[in-house]
């Protein structure tokens, strides 16, 4: 039978609950326990698929095609375990399910209420993850901050959960902040005390407190916090600001987080094997020469909009003993200032995914610059589509070429709507989503990087390369290095005679892991290193 851990947050939002959940998952897995982590999000959207990346950050896509919160990316990267649509729950999806049941008559004419129906549905979702994941421990992160109206049904549900399982079968962790007041020169515990008081008022007594701070927390302060909050001093876990999120599991291990959780859950504290993770963090702290990578996007106001792309670049740099010098470049600014002005000196260019017309011409200009200047280039999703448009306009003689998404009346729709999308009306959850196989062509850059004939990648798109122009592109120098098994869909392209120019319709960033970088990103960084003045790089084949 699975054990359950619930992680709440107090004092401020963005306190780091997701990283704590992912770190605990890593520590449990290092002891031989199977782990699954789910996120309960308090917003009314059914999923984040239609939300603005500038408001919400990136949409992380699972293997089974769920559009989820970016925290699921942290869960997968830290635990190296694939999550599913069951691991992402929103208030909107809960209410939708309950209302659908009411319409079907499942409640036999009863009055449908927040308690017990909404809270019961929430508890059922948590049990469902346990039943379908074969996990020894299910970790649940509750979004929002204790005291928010939106989070109350979730908090009530996890309070009720103690009636579903034994008290030794669940643990409550509360992540909180100890602010430093400069004028008094001390950390303050009062916000934490009030946050725990709020949590206790709804019937939840935390077993462990994870206290975020930017400076050392003394033993005396830990005793004070524990005394006021009803938590043993040893269960007050300091979590100081780290130079990298990948250092957090090691810090929490040193402070005894996993030991305390296992004690509450009455589980054996097996020996932990974190050697590979320690080596990873050592490499992060002792990087080689920096490579300058330009990320050309339209949502750069919020870095989280491209979180998985940035992490994939970091993973590749770790593997290549390089330091990532990331330059955020606004695609719209390229339209006004020119690519040369903003990209000069870059060792590589990445154009990630996106939607709509805004910034597209800037992306196309960046791609042309990378192609003509022979700078390593990687395009992702819309990045591939804009690479196709750039080639069509500047090399294939189709000066009016574009995507049907951008101009439905274009005479040359080199990118067009997938046939199965023709009659789709709703926006949410209707794209080509999830894992699909891709057949890699022999004697290509892609085959050298992947070292395999068939790979499986995650997708999120409605538009695809228009095969009516396929022969024209092939004749003019484009290489289709990856396609669907039936050959119908172009999934991966590259250019002959360029040091590194490739673009894919899928999202390889979702499959990159700290100790196992994605081949396309590692290949990009390896190619970028070749541009450094004095940094000999081993051939990428020797890395595998």
Curated annotation (Swiss-Prot):
Pfam families: CTP_synth_N, GATase. UTP binds at residues 13, 188-193, 224. ATP binds at residues 14-19, 71. GO terms for cellular component: cytosol. It comes from the Bacteria. GO terms for biological process: 'de novo' CTP biosynthetic process; pyrimidine nucleobase biosynthetic process. CDD domains: CTPS_N, GATase1_CTP_Synthase. Residues 1-267 are annotated as: Amidoligase domain. CTP binds at residues 13, 148-150, 188-193, 224. One of its GO terms (molecular function) is ATP binding. Its EC number is 6.3.4.2. It catalyses: UTP + L-glutamine + ATP + H2O = CTP + L-glutamate + ADP + phosphate + 2 H(+); L-glutamine + H2O = L-glutamate + NH4(+); UTP + NH4(+) + ATP = CTP + ADP + phosphate + 2 H(+). Residues 292-534 form the Glutamine amidotransferase type-1 domain. Pathway: Pyrimidine metabolism; CTP biosynthesis via de novo pathway; CTP from UDP: step 2/2. Allosterically activated by GTP, when glutamine is the substrate; GTP has no effect on the reaction when ammonia is the substrate. The allosteric effector GTP functions by stabilizing the protein conformation that binds the tetrahedral intermediate(s) formed during glutamine hydrolysis. Inhibited by the product CTP, via allosteric rather than competitive inhibition. It is an enzyme of class 6 (ligase). The active site is at 381 (nucleophile), 507, 509. PANTHER family: CTP SYNTHASE, CTP SYNTHASE-RELATED. Homotetramer. CTPSs have evolved a hybrid strategy for distinguishing between UTP and CTP. The overlapping regions of the product feedback inhibitory and substrate sites recognize a common feature in both compounds, the triphosphate moiety. To differentiate isosteric substrate and product pyrimidine rings, an additional pocket far from the expected kinase/ligase catalytic site, specifically recognizes the cytosine and ribose portions of the product inhibitor. Catalyzes the ATP-dependent amination of UTP to CTP with either L-glutamine or ammonia as the source of nitrogen. Regulates intracellular CTP levels through interactions with the four ribonucleotide triphosphates. This is CTP synthase. It comes from Parasynechococcus marenigrum (strain WH8102).
């Amino acid at each position: 039978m699975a054990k359950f851990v619930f992680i709440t947050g107090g004092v401020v939002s963005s306190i780091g609950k997701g990283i704590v959940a992912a770190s605990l998952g890593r520590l449990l897995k290092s002891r031989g326990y199977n782990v699954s982590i789910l996120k309960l999000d308090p917003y009314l959207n059914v999923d984040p698929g239609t939300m603005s990346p500038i408001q919400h950050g990136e949409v992380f896509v699972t293997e089974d095609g769920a559009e989820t919160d970016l925290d699921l990316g942290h869960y997968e990267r830290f635990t190296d375990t694939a999550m599913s649509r069951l691991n992402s729950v929103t208030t909107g999806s809960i209410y939708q399910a309950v209302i659908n049941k009411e319409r079907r008559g499942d409640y036999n004419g009863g009055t449908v209420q927040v308690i017990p129906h909404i809270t019961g549905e929430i508890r059922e979702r948590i049990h469902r993850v346990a039943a379908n994941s074969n996990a020894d421990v299910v970790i649940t992160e509750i979004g929002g901050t204790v005291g928010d109206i939106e989070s109350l049904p979730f908090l009530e549900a996890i309070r009720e959960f103690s009636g579903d399982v034994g008290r030794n079968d669940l643990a409550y962790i509360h992540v909180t902040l100890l602010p430093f007041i400069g004028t008094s020169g001390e950390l303050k515990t009062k916000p934490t005390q009030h946050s725990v008081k709020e949590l206790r008022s709804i019937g939840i007594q935390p077993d462990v407190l994870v206290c975020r701070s930017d400076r050392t927390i003394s033993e005396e302060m830990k005793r004070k916090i524990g005394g006021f909050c009803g938590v043993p001093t040893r269960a007050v876990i300091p979590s100081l600001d780290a130079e990298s999120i990948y250092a957090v599991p090691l810090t929490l291990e040193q402070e005894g987080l996993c030991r305390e959780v296992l004690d509450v859950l009455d589980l054996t504290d097996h020996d932990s094997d974190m050697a590979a993770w320690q080596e990873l963090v050592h490499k992060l702290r002792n990087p080689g020469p920096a490579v300058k990578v330009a990320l050309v996007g339209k949502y750069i106001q919020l870095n989280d909009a491209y979180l998985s792309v940035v992490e994939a670049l970091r993973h590749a740099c770790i593997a290549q003993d390089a330091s990532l010098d990331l330059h955020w470049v606004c695609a719209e600014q390229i339209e006004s200032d020119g690519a040369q002005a903003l990209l000069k000196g870059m060792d590589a260019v990445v154009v990630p995914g996106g939607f709509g017309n805004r910034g597209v011409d800037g992306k196309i200009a960046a791609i042309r610059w990378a192609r003509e200047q022979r700078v390593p280039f990687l395009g992702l999703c819309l990045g591939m589509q804009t690479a196709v448009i750039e080639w069509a306009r500047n090399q294939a003689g189709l000066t009016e070429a574009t995507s049907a998404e951008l101009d439905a009346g274009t005479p040359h729709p080199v990118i067009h709507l997938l046939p199965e999308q023709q009659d789709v009306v709703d926006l949410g959850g209707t794209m080509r989503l999830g894992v699909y196989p891709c057949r890699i062509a022999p004697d290509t850059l892609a085959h050298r990087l992947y070292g395999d004939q068939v790979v499986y990648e995650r997708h999120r798109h409605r538009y695809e390369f228009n095969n009516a122009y396929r022969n024209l592109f092939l004749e003019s120098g484009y290489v289709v290095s990856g396609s669907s098994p039936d050959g119908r869909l172009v999934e991966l392209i590259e250019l002959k005679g360029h040091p590194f120019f490739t673009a894919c319709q899928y999202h390889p960033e979702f499959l990159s892991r700290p100790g196992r970088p994605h081949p396309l990103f590692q290949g990009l960084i390896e190619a970028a290193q070749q541009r450094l003045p004095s940094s000999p790089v081993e051939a990428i084949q020797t890395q595998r």
